């Protein structure tokens, strides 16, 4: 459904025969495979979508796509499982002019840049702090930080500047994670441990960012999002919702006699109906991210959410692990270690 593109190949190594049949019907004229390397070699595509949610498969697929001359890659998130793989893909992109974009679709919502403009103009007052929480379901803790937290962390440099340092701790049932709590995590993400995480990031702007996730905290996904706490308002982001952003006006720490409600914030501003038609499809349907990737290829620029942004997000996550390994010590970014620090706990 993206203009200027045509699907030429589809591959799924775990596909059942009926899935292949369905793919043939969905993508008429495209070749369908159960081996992605064969698909790449036979179709030589310009753009490749790397779709597995299992992150340990991502790096090999990117390298295979680059080998056959792909010019752009649209990747499932999280990006990769450690900074070794992230560094390799960033270097590969620079060497070959390969544009890698990540499917953190909320970052592409046009209202995000409008919030940044309002912050810079002081229309919410002074930005004091930012707070993010994961879904805090059964995945609460480091898995939540990886899988859902990456959606949030990737957005924060837009408002706060790049991360420069981190302090963080992992807990298992209220006690700090030790070596015996560490094991291979789900979804090919590598080593992790614990069912709670509490982290504080120092950002380039001087405004702190907090991330917290506790397993089974309560109502499903009730806290999943980011809040920018300003002196005159709280700006709330709910991932994958529409409206995605709402504002509660007033001083955030002052008790009031009357309840204050939330005002939707769109690409038109506060209290303005979203001027873009079908905004849900454009964002949730990955239309805006795909169009940005096409423009990035044509203009020879970094995508809005590219490999560099992906690497920063991975580095933020692993900096929490590195701080925990050092008993909550402050660690600076970029990290010295490029592997998962929990392997050295």
Task: List each model region and its residues.
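Beta-strand-loop-alpha-helix segment that lines the small-molecule cofactor/substrate pocket
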Residues: 42, 47, 59-108, 122
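N-terminal Rossmann-like dinucleotide-binding module
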Residues: 1-27, 51
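C-terminal helical cap and adjacent loop that interface with cofactors, partners, or active-site loops
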Residues: 256-345
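Contiguous beta-strand/loop segments that form the cofactor/metal-binding neighborhood of enzyme cores
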Residues: 150-252, 287-303, 318-320, 335-345
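Short acidic-hydrophobic, aromatic-tinged amphipathic segments that line or gate anion-handling sites
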Residues: 31-35
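NAD(P)-dependent dehydrogenases' Rossmann-like dinucleotide-binding region
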Residues: 103-109, 113-114, 118-140, 152, ...
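Short glycine-/small-residue-rich Rossmann-like dinucleotide-binding loops
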Residues: 44, 52-54, 213
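Core-facing hydrophobic residues within beta-strands of well-ordered domains
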Residues: 5-7, 70, 127, 163
């Amino acid at each position: 459904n993206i203009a200027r593109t045509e699907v030429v190949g589809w591959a799924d190594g775990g596909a059942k025969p009926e899935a292949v049949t369905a793919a043939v019907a969905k993508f008429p004229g495209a070749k369908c495979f159960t081996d992605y390397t064969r698909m790449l070699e036979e179709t030589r595509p310009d753009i490749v979508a790397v779709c597995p949610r299992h992150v340990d498969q991502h790096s090999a697929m990117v390298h295979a796509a680059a080998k056959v001359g792909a010019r752009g890659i649209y990747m499932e998130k999280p990006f990769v499982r450690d900074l070794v793989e992230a560094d390799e893909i960033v270097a590969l992109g620079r060497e070959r002019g390969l544009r890698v974009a990540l499917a953190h679709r909320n970052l592409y919502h046009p209202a995000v840049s409008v919030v940044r403009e309002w912050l810079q103009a002081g229309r919410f007052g002074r930005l004091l702090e930012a707070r993010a929480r994961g879904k805090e379901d059964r995945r609460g803790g480091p898995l939540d930080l990886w899988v859902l937290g990456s959606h949030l962390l990737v957005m924060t440099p837009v408002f706060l500047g790049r991360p420069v340092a981190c302090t963080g701790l992992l807990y298992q049932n209220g006690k700090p994670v030790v070596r015996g709590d560490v094991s291979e995590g789900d979804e090919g993400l590598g080593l992790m441990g614990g069912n709670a995480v509490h982290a504080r990031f120092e950002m380039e702007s001087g405004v702190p960012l907090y991330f917290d996730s506790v397993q089974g905290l309560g109502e499903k996904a009730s806290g999943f999002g980011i809040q920018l706490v300003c002196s005159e308002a709280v700006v709330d982001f709910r991932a994958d919702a529409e409206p995605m952003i709402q504002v509660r006006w007033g001083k955030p720490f002052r008790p009031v006699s009357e309840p204050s409600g939330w005002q939707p914030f769109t690409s038109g501003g506060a209290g303005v109906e979203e001027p873009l038609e079908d905004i849900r499809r454009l964002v949730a349907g990955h239309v805006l991210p795909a169009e940005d990737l096409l423009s990035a290829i044509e203009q020879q620029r970094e995508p809005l959410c590219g490999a560099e942004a992906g690497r920063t997000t991975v580095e933020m996550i692993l900096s929490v692990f590195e701080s925990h390994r050092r008993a909550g010590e402050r660690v600076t970014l970029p990290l010295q270690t490029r592997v998962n620090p929990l392997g050295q706990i």
